[in-house]
């Protein structure tokens, strides 16, 4: 498969999968789940190495189950009721995909996501949301100020960039509101682009996050 070819050709990717497999093994889950679509690059090889089935979850909440022998089938007939998964993700921000799609899709099959395993936690509240949802998060990397302060000392980022990042980490909501107020045409321009840009801008508006002065006229 393409994933196996990438594992063979990229030592960093292979080592990452080794680390995730080691972490996932300790959960003793019944199967592995992953969400469309970046999660699949991590969840599928980990499932294969653990000898477990894999539940592919799509954004429309549809699912496909592939057993440990590589046979794909209708998830409803896969006997997942009462089973527990470890859901493997690339990145956790505020866990919105879990809340909107991954958790409901697994529960619709009578199963539960019992554990979450991610490569990176951006440390923006997603971990607490997952804990409250009953699928506590384990991560290989958590984004903290130390990461960016080290990058600054190494000359990878400027002082201005460091200041911006630290301000965002300290209060992401206030940072974004200040940004929108400083760029009052930003949401209008994003909506005009269409596609995902428009969807994100409209979500920002409908969620009540955008300040009144930053709303499209």
Task: Show which residues each predicted segment covers.
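PRPP-associated nucleotide enzymes
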Residues: 1-89, 93-217
């Amino acid at each position: 498969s393409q994933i196996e070819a990438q594992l063979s050709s990229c030592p960093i990717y292979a080592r990452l999968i080794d680390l995730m497999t080691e972490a996932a093994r300790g959960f003793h889950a019944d199967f592995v789940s992953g969400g469309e679509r970046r999660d699949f690059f991590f969840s599928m090889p980990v499932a294969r190495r653990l000898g477990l089935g894999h539940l592919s979850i799509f954004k429309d909440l549809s699912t496909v189950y592939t057993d440990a022998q590589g046979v794909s089938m209708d998830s409803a007939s896969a006997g997942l009721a009462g089973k527990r998964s470890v859901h493997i993700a690339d990145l956790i921000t505020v866990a919105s995909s879990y809340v909107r799609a991954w958790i409901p899709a697994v529960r619709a099959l009578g199963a539960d996501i019992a554990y979450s395993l991610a490569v990176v936690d951006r440390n923006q509240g997603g971990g607490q949301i997952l804990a409250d949802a009953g699928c506590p998060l384990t991560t290989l990397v958590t984004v903290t100020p130390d990461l960016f302060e080290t990058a600054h000392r190494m000359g990878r980022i400027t002082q201005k960039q460091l200041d911006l990042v630290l301000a965002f980490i300290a209060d992401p909501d206030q940072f974004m509101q200040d940004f929108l107020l400083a760029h009052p045409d930003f949401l209008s321009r994003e909506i005009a682009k269409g596609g995902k840009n428009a969807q994100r801008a409209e979500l920002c508006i409908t969620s009540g996050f955008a300040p009144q002065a930053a709303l499209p006229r």
